[in-house]
Amino acid sequence: MFSPADNIFIILITGEFILGILGNGYIALVNWIDWIKKKKISTIDYILTNLVISRICLISVMVVNGIVIAVYPDVYTKSKLQIAICTFWTFANYLNMWITTCLNVFYFLKIANSSHPLFLWLKQKIDMVVRWILLGCFAISLLVSLIAAIVLSYDYRFHAIAKHKRNITEMFHVSKRPYFEPLTLFNLFAIVPFIVSLISFFLLVRSLWRHTKQIKLYATGGRDPSTEVHVRAIKTMTSFIFLFFLYYISSILVTFSYLMTKYKLAVEFGEIVAILYPLGHSLILIVLNNKLRQTFVRMLTCRKIACVI
């Protein structure tokens, strides 16, 4: 029998899963239809499509991981299912983080203004740069997940041997750390692409500040289009920073939940909060992206008309 906390956890995480799949699936579908109609895809749509696919994978593996850990902990710790789930989690996590970083760097290169030769070259070759970056994102994520799988396999064999030998000391560690995997701690190093995103964010804010100063010299009332684009990009990047901070903190909570008396509750809470990152940021992208937002509004309008008819 599940406890009330388990029931609440399953309901919440199922709701997050549905919203996450619908939100990210909507972005992928809109971009795919637009690609079919125009026979080409813009760089921003290409990045977003890759991003939401990685987030669908991330949300799916996080939901499976959360349910198995919280509801069936014995199955998780006593089988090789742990290796498979955590390897896919690492791959999806790193891929998602690096593609999001690619998106933030794209915003900076596309919107910001600078006279630096390197910046001008990257801005001119942005389409080629983005495609190479995305290829690099996939390669890095695959390499990291393979290394993580090896580390986790070694850890699994070590604890199996310790348990088999009935060594008191090792058995103590095995029994006291059911939710602590090297892979979870390994995923915390995804802060590296986050730092790159943070640098892009501050450079974009600096560009907006300089642009605003120039506007004031000639200025007239209202915002110019460039300022609006700056502000929209900064809103998107700010939401990413905030949601990733929650994701990072919740990952730390899950990682060290074995130290807490109510570790199962800590794991459930951490998983629920962590999924808000790939779910919430994609919903914010829909709201702040003109094409995605207008398409959604047209869908609602058509549905209302159909209901009236």
Swiss-Prot record:
Q: According to Swiss-Prot or TrEMBL, what is its membrane topology? A: Multi-pass membrane protein
- Which terms in the Gene Ontology molecular function aspect does this entry carry? bitter taste receptor activity; G protein-coupled receptor activity
Look up the signal peptide feature and give its range.
none
Cited InterPro entries: GPCR_Rhodpsn_7TM (IPR017452), TAS2R (IPR007960)
Extracellular compartment segments:
1-7, 72-82, 153-184, 261-266
List, alphabetically, the PANTHER family matched: TASTE RECEPTOR TYPE 2, TASTE RECEPTOR TYPE 2 MEMBER 8
The species is Gorilla gorilla gorilla
Q: Cytoplasmic side of the membrane: what ranges?
A: 29-50, 104-131, 206-239, 288-309
Q: Under what name is this protein listed?
A: Taste receptor type 2 member 8
Q: Which residues are glycosylated?
A: N167
The residue stretches assigned to a coiled coil in this entry are: none
Name the GO cellular-component terms.
Answer: membrane; plasma membrane
Top-level taxonomic group = Eukaryota
- Which keywords belong to this entry? G-protein coupled receptor, Glycoprotein, Membrane, Receptor, Sensory transduction, Taste, Transducer, Transmembrane, Transmembrane helix
Entry's transmembrane regions = 8-28, 51-71, 83-103, 132-152, 185-205, 240-260, 267-287
| Pfam families per UniProt | TAS2R
Localization of this protein: Membrane
Recorded family membership: Belongs to the G-protein coupled receptor T2R family.
Additional remark text: Most taste cells may be activated by a limited number of bitter compounds; individual taste cells can discriminate among bitter stimuli.
Question: Would the keyword Ribonucleoprotein be found if you checked this record's keyword annotation?
Answer: no
**Which BP terms does GO give this entry?**
detection of chemical stimulus involved in sensory perception of bitter taste
Instruction: Name the job this protein performs.
Output: Receptor that may play a role in the perception of bitterness and is gustducin-linked. May play a role in sensing the chemical composition of the gastrointestinal content. The activity of this receptor may stimulate alpha gustducin, mediate PLC-beta-2 activation and lead to the gating of TRPM5.
